[in-house]
Amino acid sequence: MAWISLILSLLALSSGGAISQAVVTQESALTTSPGETVTLTCRSSTGAVTTSNYANWVQEKPDHLFTGLIGGTNNRAPGVPARFSGSLIGDKAALTITGAQTEDEAIYFCALWYSNH
């Protein structure tokens, strides 16, 4: 049985304020099997993640190729397979991979936008 390792990293983007004011947390690592559905989540220390945080998800493959998957919480980038979807679950941003494939093994970054305006 093949396993897919999904490693998660953090990124917070700020506008008009200090980036250190917000801490973004995710699961440190997840493993799943091909064909399974997996959901990665991203939480903010400043409160609930909302559509105003414009959650973005980026994938980094082992060869250091970066691909933007989701922008603005739930907008899939052109050319990204339909198995990737973004949403809000409770107070967190989420990336769901429905029917994970072996080629989905990667590091996934969550980026949130913060604004004092």
UniProtKB/Swiss-Prot annotation:
Listed SMART domains: IG, IGv
Transmembrane feature ranges: none
InterPro entries per the UniProt record, alphabetical: Ig-like_dom, Ig-like_dom_sf, Ig-like_fold, Ig_sub, Ig_V-set, IgV_Light_Chain
PROSITE patterns, sorted: IG_LIKE
Modified residues (Pyrrolidone carboxylic acid): Q21
Residues in the signal sequence: 1-20
SUPFAM superfamilies assigned: Immunoglobulin
CC per GO annotation: immunoglobulin complex; plasma membrane
Keyword vocabulary terms for this entry: Adaptive immunity, Immunity, Immunoglobulin, Pyrrolidone carboxylic acid, Signal
Sequence ranges assigned to domain Ig-like in this UniProt record: 21-117
GO biological process, one term: adaptive immune response
Name this polypeptide is given: Ig lambda-1 chain V region
Record organism: Mus musculus
Lineage: Eukaryota, Metazoa, Chordata, Craniata, Vertebrata
